[in-house]
From Swiss-Prot:
The gene is lplC. It is a multi-pass membrane protein. Keywords: Cell membrane, Membrane, Transmembrane, Transmembrane helix, Transport. The keyword Zinc-finger does not apply. It comes from Bacillus subtilis (strain 168). The chain crosses the membrane at residues 21-41, 81-101, 116-136, 142-162, 199-219, 260-280. It is found in: Cell membrane. This is Protein LplC. Belongs to the binding-protein-dependent transport system permease family. CysTW subfamily.
């Protein structure tokens, strides 16, 4: 400790600290500035966007792009659909992934290796888009919310990571719980899951971001526009704004600027995830270290 303290008090140590701060500050600026530009652009006018005459703050503040997006008839309904799919889909994925990973982590479970090999096989060789579509259709899931949830219920890669985490839990905890009369299911619910809070928070964030940003599965399985998630509606808004701009209606002030709508759509689609992250941050940092340290 004394050597470390002395190093930081030397000239070389202070130079290193300054360079480290400048480097990390530069990386932070490179990361944050694009987001600030997008936010500022969503509030800028058409002329400013065309001339790129703003940086962090627009010269003329306008809400036209947001008014146009929020005035879309299906916007609020699609927002509710996305929230429902994200919450339910995340819960379903966490439930199936953890309940499958726990028995796979137990060496005494019969057929464990066969099932694990099937999981790895499905990760390396997926069924493909058309076969998956035919399965969804045969199950009667087309044009239902479950078509956006059940086909992605288990992620093989995440399953293997969580299985490895359960294998690292001390066996003494399980043995002590069983001595106290706890069943295998009781050990899972009362011992393994409470110790898995950082893991649950980490994968909940991963699953939620994936479901929230997904529009491809809705494009495949949902034909009813009343059941479109937010990403599909925002995609349609962007396409319509492109068509309107191509026809020259934007110059007649029929709609807000094409680029402004796109930037507003990015902000709207990103804000919910940014709002959730601070609440999971303390668990997220721990969960990222899954499997990196043993003992």
């Amino acid at each position: 400790m004394a050597e470390i303290h002395t190093m930081h008090n030397t000239k070389a140590g202070r130079v290193f600290d300054v360079c480290n701060i400048l480097f990390l500050g530069g990386v932070g600026a490179i990361t944050i500035l694009p987001f600030l530009y997008i936010i500022a652009g969503s509030f800028a006018t058409e002329a400013e966007l065309a001339q790129r005459s703003f940086f962090i703050f627009p010269k003329t503040f306008t809400l036209d792009a947001y008014k146009y997006v929020f005035s879309t008839p299906t916007f609020l309904r699609s927002m509710g659909v996305s929230i429902f799919i994200t919450v339910v889909g995340t819960a379903v994925q966490l439930f199936f992934t953890f309940t499958m990973a726990y028995p796979l982590a137990k060496r005494h479970v019969k057929g464990r290796n066969l099932l694990l090999n099937l999981v790895i096989f499905s990760m390396l060789f997926s069924g493909g888009m058309i076969p998956t579509y035919l399965v969804v259709k045969s199950l009667g899931l087309l044009d239902t919310y479950w078509a956006l949830i059940l086909p992605m219920a288990i992620n093989p890669f995440n399953l293997i990571i969580i299985k490895n985490f359960f294998q690292q839990l001390p066996r003494e905890l399980e043995e002590s719980a069983k001595i106290d009369g706890c069943s295998e299911i009781g050990v899972f619910w009362r011992i393994a899951l409470p110790l898995s809070k950082p893991v649950i928070a980490t994968f909940a964030l991963f699953y939620a971001v994936g479901i929230w940003n997904d529009f491809f599965h809705a494009l495949l399985y949902i034909n009813d526009s009343a059941k479109w998630p937010l990403q599909m509606v925002l995609r349609q808004v962007t396409i319509l704004s492109d068509l309107t701009a191509t026809n020259g209606d934007t110059m007649q002030n029929a709609v807000p600027p094409e680029q402004g709508i796109k930037l507003a759509v990015i902000v709207i689609a990103t804000l919910p995830i940014l709002a959730v992250y601070p609440f999971l941050q303390k668990h997220f940092a721990k969960g990222m270290l899954i499997g990196s340290v043993k003992g």
